[in-house]
Amino acid sequence: ENLAVKLHPEKVEQISEVVISGVTRKKYKNKKENPAYAIMQEVWKRRKTNGLANYNDYQFKEYEKIEIGLNNIDSAFMKKKIFSNLEFIFDYADSANFDKKLALPVFFNETIYKTYGKNHPEKKENRIIVANKFSGFNDNELIASTAKNQFKEVNIYDNTLNFFNIGFPSPAGTDGFNTYEYELTDSVSVDGIEAFVIKYFPRNKEILAFQGNLLISKDTYNIVKAALRSTNKINVNFVNGIYLENEYENLDDNIFLPKRTYTELEMSVLGKKKDAKSILFKRTGIFSEYEFNKNFSENFLADKGQTLSDDNLKKADDFWERQRTEPLSETEQNVYKMVGELEQVPKFKRIVKLVEILESGYINAWNSIDFGDIYSVYGNNEVEGDRIRAGARTYFSPNDMWRIAGYTAYGFKDQKLKYGLEGRYMFN
């Protein structure tokens, strides 16, 4: 049979060679005969600590990209009635993900952070939002916050890596050989560093574990790059798959710093069949501009009370061109372009408005007055019987310093009219 190899056009220049390997596994009488075991022993002897813990204080820049897409779409999905007059959006679908399933990006978010931390006399850290950019919808903060909460930083040298509050054995942990088979498959050069390529896979396919490869420096036995993919047997509610790729900058033989991390999470409430529709979360985090022992002011450690929708975080396009640590791919640029086109379609505007109403529970009546909560219009209880309620509130923005709300309600069983009025003011 013919073998087709697909390459993403934006990444081809980064590829020095392509290695195609089968599933043949070399058998060893014992692990000491396995050359990968000797290499992993050196890794364990020289286990690294995150370099941030080795300084009195530290600061660094983080550039983060988050994308959400409808995954595993097909022609039948594209022909659904809801997409009439919106067919052009499928021109933006692509398969730029690990499993190469066709996905339609629907949300994109960029954030730049500046993190300040101190280790002495006690551990303190503050992550300040410098700039934030949404893909164009009216209210993205809830979507972005939900997406960001799905991702957690992991230390590859830990024995256990936590995802969704579930522990997965780390392939670089000291007890890795209890869970994984290791195989030395190749040697490569990564940014001028000669590295071993060690492939790993779980001994037991039924357990929660990863498969992938580790790139390990031949000189210092640092992990230069790690790729982790959950097995097909992953048994976590609503989670179809996890893929993680981490790159590290090693300052010396004892410490490392995170350099780049890329994560994909595929989630679905519709089941785990191969053709099931799912939501694909993708996150890229790039860390740079590390500085240490600068003795910065304690003010940098004070909580700023920021939200992603703060007006002062909105920056012009030329700011983003200068400050992006990594340029946007064609797919990422197209999310902004697609949303711009969608916002010109009346049907889409109505869909967005409906989603906003369902999300907030309020209907904008005029100017800054909302009616709601719509979920409280009707109720039933022992005292009032059937109950109807009408309410309203002021709403200028998600960050209102003050807000007034009121309601009136009537119970048909007790035949009593109720009402209430409240005012809120945020002092800080």
Task: Label each residue range with its predicted role.
Residues T24-A195, F201-A209, L270-G379:
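Structured extracytoplasmic
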Residues L251-D253, S397-N399, N428:
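Outer-membrane beta-barrel channels and translocator barrels
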Residues G212-L214, K218, Y243-D253:
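Extended lipid/amphipathic-ligand handling interfaces
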Residues E1-K32, Y243, T263-V269, D275-A276:
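Periplasmic N-terminal soluble interaction domains immediately after the signal peptide in Gram-negative
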Residues F238-N240, L265-I279, R424-N428:
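Outer-membrane beta-barrel translocator/channel fold
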Residues Y200, A227-N232, I369-N380, A390-G391, ...:
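Transmembrane beta-strand segments that form the barrel wall of outer-membrane beta-barrel proteins
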Residues A4, M40, E245, R389-G391, ...:
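Membrane-embedded beta-strand positions in outer-membrane beta-barrel channels/transporters
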Residues P258, W402-G406, N428:
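Transmembrane beta-strands of outer-membrane beta-barrel proteins
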